[in-house]
Amino acid sequence: MNKLLIICDMFPPAFAPRMGYLCKYLTRMGWEVTVVTEYIEDNTFEFLTGYADVYCVRYYKASGKISKHIEWMWVMFLDILFGYKDMKIINACIPLIKTNQYKGILCSTYRTFPLTAAKPLAIHTNLPFVVDLRDIIEQYASNEYISHKFHTFSWLDAFITKRFRKRLLRKRNNALEVADCVTTVSPWHVEVLKQYNPNVKLIYNGFDPELFYPQQIKTSRFIITSVSYTHLRAHETPEHL
């Protein structure tokens, strides 16, 4: 049986239905999928579970508003200095790679993490390496890609954000350069990412043939309809739409 290792920033029952549907289709085609992802407490896409063996790495345990922010800052500090988040992902993947004969590694993210964990694993194993970027930092008008505010002085926030953005882009682009293939969600994304890897493929987001399919309706009138897809980001809730 063909086996695939997926390393991603989030996975159902939390967000990232793109990877959830991929696993659903791959299992139908006879593939066995292993997913290593960050633990996120959310059940929005619970209906997409059960199609892969999922291993979650938990970074955050605090429950209070203030303690959550402090913990987030601490994890970010450890990650910047020591690559903390990447090392935990790598440590979770190593025993899986040793006991399974994977055909390739796929890393999906909306920003950079966990590309910097998937890259050395792909290089070390010499497995085909595919990167899937659901969103890219360049598409944001401001700093919406950062999940928390730093809450320091305004000038210091601006300095930290600028350095943080530059660091994320550098790490992402370094990973793209060694990927065998890159997939993304729109023609514009393709053109941006081709600067770092010439083999970029377009796979549109938000389409599932089980939900959207042609249906014949008997009617005496000619009706024009339109279909729209609303992208729900991980930090948003439906009532905000």
Stretch-by-stretch model annotation:
Residues K194, F207-R221:
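Acidic anion/phosphate-binding donor-loop and adjacent secondary structure
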Residues F113-T116, P120-H124, I137-Y140, T152-V182:
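Membrane-proximal helix-turn-helix segments that form the acceptor-binding/catalytic region
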Residues M1-Y59, C181:
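N-terminal subdomain of nucleotide-sugar transferases
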Residues K3, T219-I224:
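Charged active-site motifs of nucleotide-sugar-dependent glycosyltransferases
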Residues W188, G206:
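Carbohydrate-associated surface elements
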